[in-house]
Swiss-Prot record:
Catalytic activity, reaction form: a plastoquinone + NADH + (n+1) H(+)(in) = a plastoquinol + NAD(+) + n H(+)(out); a plastoquinone + NADPH + (n+1) H(+)(in) = a plastoquinol + NADP(+) + n H(+)(out)
Main location: membrane
Protein name, per record: NAD(P)H-quinone oxidoreductase chain 4
Organism: Prochlorococcus marinus (strain MIT 9301)
Gene Ontology biological process terms from the UniProt entry: ATP synthesis coupled electron transport; electron transport coupled proton transport
NCBIfam families for this protein: NDH_I_M, PRK02546.1, PRK12561.1
Amino acid sequence: MLGAGLSNFPWLSASILFPIGSAFVIPFFPDKGDGKEVRWFALSIALITFLITVGSYINGFDINNENVQLKENISWLPDLGLTWSVGADGMSMPLILLTSFITALAVLAAWPVKFKPKLFFFLILVMDGGQIAVFAVQDMLLFFLTWELELIPVYLLLAIWGGKNRQYAATKFIIYTAGSSIFILLAALAMGFYGTEIPNFEFSHLAAQDFNQKFQIFCYVGLLIAFGVKLPIVPLHTWLPDAHGEATAPVHMLLAGILLKMGGYALLRFNAQLLPVAHAQFAPLLIVLGVVNIIYAALTSFAQRNLKRKIAYSSISHMGFVLIGIGSFSSLGTSGAMLQMVSHGLIGASLFFLVGATYDRTKTLKLDEMSGVGQKMRIMFALWTACSLASLALPGMSGFVSELMVFTGFVTDEVYTLPFRVVMASLAAIGVILTPIYLLSMLREIFFGKENPKLIEERKLIDAEPREVYIIACLLLPIIGIGLYPRLVTESYIASINNLVDRDLTAVKSAVKTNIFSGTKTNDILKAPTI
């Protein structure tokens, strides 16, 4: 009886509304003191939210079911066709868990925040619920609203608690992300009103629609721009290094760990799932853009002398594998893209947290001024080394498995011609080779070499404290666990990914056989698969 009650519990609505509702309790806390009560309250709410998302996975989610589960559907504004529709399938559940997990650690990372702690933790909790909502909603208009909701906390967290150029970085972030979001609204309205006067924005309804080719291309291009900004895709990426360059450590963790994954998830959910004919035509472009991301960002990261910007460009490079996986038309490659999002969420959060912790001690981000601090911070060096090895895809860690899955899935799948696969894989390998070069050289510059006397004398360089070790340990544990046994994560989404890929392969086969790509470059790259 208890099990039946738990299975009927509105897990997803609770995981969205609980942190947002709890955030509105924070203004009633007293302003006196250092904000200790607010910190403990925010941490408690974030941990409970994480437990709620874990409960949704344990009590109501079937990993063998490819369909949307844990569905909650309440008519909200029927005249506008808007419903409170939430649910989770294999593509959203891992990211919901990742969001609540990273947010809880980000709250712990924000423990030293002394300036306006009430507002800071209020925004973090609102952001927690908003980001979970992005992955859980099953209505496209509601998706747009939640997509916009999480922009406000990020903007304020950058503009108020950022570095010297925080206003510029925050303004650039909001212009890029909010400006590109208009394409989501236009696509939602076009798809919701398609062929009817009564709008319906639910994903299940849109997936059943037979959108014509030109309509799909129109929506696909707009959504690719909007989601490409968030992923980000070169050349829509320039907001990210500026945002990371000014953000504090907990905001870093949320940006790298969760925000970028929203773009990859949305490409899978909308472009690949709802617009399969257009996806068949644009998938080769995604492959090319993914390779450009990997090489360009790796080269740029190699040249950076600012620690935050170096890691920011490294993130852009790693997200290129997500693009390749999404465009691969391979179950293995697309599964690798999903795993790469989870893996990079953990690795990116760990690296950016360490960047913040290192800056708190050295008060500089310039690599030229950091040499020789390893003698004073040996535990910090060990943490940096472990997380850097994870980022360069060391075997036994999650990054290795996800990148290998993407490469293998793309290269071995026969949807693309052999020359295209060989050329793209060879170019992407350049970025893979560059990654250990710039990461290991970064470690050498920070921790080894001749000590900077000015830095050593002026700063009391203390080693990592227990709170910092605990945060990194919490991130490294799943990184290593996934690296050793990937099925911990892949089993949760493989049924949904197989269903998605089958749908896209059918579109490719139909498109090629009907000469839909006749006279285009795509026609020379794609060939009809055997299904």
